[in-house]
Amino acid sequence: MPGKIGKVVQVIGPVVDIKFDSDSLPNLYNAISIDMGERTLIAEVEQHVGDDIVRTIAMEATEGLKRGMDAVDTEKAISVPVGDQVLGRLFNVLGKPIDNAGEVEAEEIYPIHRPAPSFKDQAVEPEMFETGIKVIDLLAPYQRGGKIGLFGGAGVGKTVLIQELINNIAKEHGGLSVFTGVGERSREGNDLYHEMRESGVIDKTALVFGQMNEPPGARMRVALTGLTMAEYFRDKGQDVLLFIDNIFRFTQAGSEVSALLGRIPSAVGYQPTLATEMGALQERITSTKNGSITSVQAVYVPADDLTDPAPATTFSHLDATTVLSRSIVELGIYPAVDPLESSSRILDPRLVGEEHYNVATKVKNILERYKELQDIIAILGVDELSDEDKAVVSRARKVQRFLSQPFTVGEQFTGMPGKYVSVKETIKGFKEILEGKYDDLPESAFLFIGSVEEAVQKAKSLA
């Protein structure tokens, strides 16, 4: 039974105004279907304008759309397939497969606009989530069911870090992942899909893409599509990983849509509803008594300015932040995680244990001291330092290099096999470096290795 039928009266880019009878206006967020002959265009109701016109945002390109075309109210929000059938598949914002592998026979279809779990259904049992990446596990550990932000400017390695996390989680934990590409490069999405197929982790992952060549409506809603698929698995008792690359593009698309809808912009040209939109998305990413969603969100930082409203609004929702720094890229250390800027709420002796907390604190202290001494070294040289400070500099440089690690997903570029290092091994390695056990080894022996024992082997080969 078709829903209410209206007529297209105005098209301005992705904004489509549709006239309905005043007593049968579609609800906000309803999906409107417009038959264009060769294809069907889906648009979402964003505003009611006057008595009989709804203003919608198209989820696909509007080329070929004309005034006078029929538009049918589907009487429900955009709905996407969920369940085991979505694993190993590639979707767009509407939940349509885009991998040329046939239709998805899903048991259930969920609307992308859903309420966040109620307060009484949420579970907060802080527990550490091992990633196998030394710098993260030691200094800014992730919480199971927490929200993690990867902050960094252009080209510092956010996407590579996300790919390594997907790889480690699938292989070491056997967990399910939902990867949502929001307004990023299609080439990277294509690479990710093919790499996942080759490495065999695709069967545990659903991929949803709304890339940077798509209209702002698709980029604004695709994060909700991925989240909806993840929520289904969580409610069925699974521990799910939700990757969003890039959450800034979600804000950026919201800003474009807001301007197109004629709202007055707020600070730095962003939409006045920035905090509300971000809150509506982030509040749904939570753990319940059934299962958990651990989310890792890449956050592009415009002009490396962390006070920009988009990254600043995201900050307030996160449990851990992993900050990638250009100054560390310049040192040739990857992953380029800034050990002093990155932080985690669960780096607490009651949650990670006394030993982990003490080693992490000492590592931060020695790096902080090294940073202070760098000014003196730049002016007077290392020889003018006291013996104690020379030892600090030597160990700090070893610690700095030991924070690097070869990645499995980077193996084809570096030629080095990737390493997964357990938390226990990580703590042991840093503890021994700080105690001076490896003072006689050259600092280059600590670059791009897994456990600390490999430094001894590498030193022999360098000698």
Curated annotation (Swiss-Prot):
The EC number(s) this enzyme carries: 7.1.2.2
Catalytic activity line of the entry: ATP + H2O + 4 H(+)(in) = ADP + phosphate + 5 H(+)(out)
Positions with a binding annotation for ATP: 152-159
One term under GO cellular component: plasma membrane
A Pfam family: ATP-synt_ab
InterPro entries in the record: AAA+_ATPase, ATP-synt_VA_C, ATP_synth_F1_bsu, ATPase_a/bsu_AS, ATPase_alpha/beta_chains, ATPase_F1/V1/A1_a/bsu_N, ATPase_F1/V1/A1_a/bsu_N_sf, ATPase_F1/V1/A1_a/bsu_nucl-bd
Keywords: ATP synthesis, ATP-binding, Cell membrane, CF(1), Hydrogen ion transport, Ion transport, Membrane, Nucleotide-binding, Translocase, Transport
Subcellular location: Cell membrane
SUPFAM superfamilies reported in the protein's UniProt record: C-terminal domain of alpha and beta subunits of F1 ATP synthase, N-terminal domain of alpha and beta subunits of F1 ATP synthase, P-loop containing nucleoside triphosphate hydrolases
Chief place of localization: membrane
GO MF, one annotated term: proton-transporting ATP synthase activity, rotational mechanism
Gene3D superfamilies assigned: 2.40.10.170, Bovine Mitochondrial F1-atpase, Atp Synthase Beta Chain, Chain D, domain 3, P-loop containing nucleotide triphosphate hydrolases
Disulfide bonds: none
Topology in the lipid bilayer: Peripheral membrane protein
Quaternary assembly: F-type ATPases have 2 components, CF(1) - the catalytic core - and CF(0) - the membrane proton channel. CF(1) has five subunits: alpha(3), beta(3), gamma(1), delta(1), epsilon(1). CF(0) has three main subunits: a(1), b(2) and c(9-12). The alpha and beta chains form an alternating ring which encloses part of the gamma chain. CF(1) is attached to CF(0) by a central stalk formed by the gamma and epsilon chains, while a peripheral stalk is formed by the delta and b chains.
Protein family per UniProt: Belongs to the ATPase alpha/beta chains family.
NCBIfam families hit by this protein: atpD
Entry-linked HAMAP family: ATP_synth_beta_bact (MF_01347)
Functional summary from the UniProt entry: Produces ATP from ADP in the presence of a proton gradient across the membrane. The catalytic sites are hosted primarily by the beta subunits.
Protein name: ATP synthase subunit beta
Species assigned in the record: Clostridium botulinum (strain Eklund 17B / Type B)
Lineage of producing organism: Bacteria, Bacillati, Bacillota, Clostridia, Eubacteriales
Encoding gene per record: atpD
